[in-house]
Amino acid sequence: LSDAAPVAPHLYILADDLIWATRLAGQGRTLGAAVVTLNGISDLQALVARGPLSAQDLIAIDTTARGFEPEAAVRAAASAGRTLALAQHDDPSLRAALLEAGALRVMPYRALFERGHAILAELLGLPLPAVGSLEAPSGSGGTTK
């Protein structure tokens, strides 16, 4: 048996909106993910060029961003790994296009606000912290502060 600690999944975030990027990053860190904020489409392209991500890693893309075309960004991200698209709840045609482009899931911002920790925990394969806890569960079952 190995004593090596399990490697935390990565949560890569591509978002122009600082509030949503910060919220996603905070939720990912609370869960124990290794959070990486991508600074624009060029960072996403560099990530994709490195090759496939691990099976637990997740790329979250804010599709309301103005600096890139959302469907193309989701298509590029999905070629490297699992992709979560964040979109407005009232745009069913965009939702369908993002799923067609390869998004694993298209989540409205309201769901991120209301159930973001639970959704990200499920997608990243991480345990959900106890309600009111400031501790993130570690991969070994203990907690880290």
Residue ranges and their predicted role:
Residues 90-105:
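Alpha4 helix (beta4-alpha4-beta5 surface) of REC/receiver domains from two-component response regulators
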Residues 18-36:
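Two-component/phosphorelay signaling modules centered on CheY-like receiver
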Residues 1-10, 25, 117-145:
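Non-catalytic signal-transmission and effector/linker regions of two-component phosphorelay proteins
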Residues 40-58:
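Acidic, metal-coordinating helix/loop segments flanking the phosphotransfer/catalytic sites
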Residues 8-18:
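Conserved acidic segment of CheY-like receiver
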Residues 102-117:
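Output/docking surface of receiver
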Residues 81-90:
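A short, hydrophobic beta-strand element within the central beta-sheet of small alpha/beta folds
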Residues 59-76:
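Conserved phosphotransfer microenvironments
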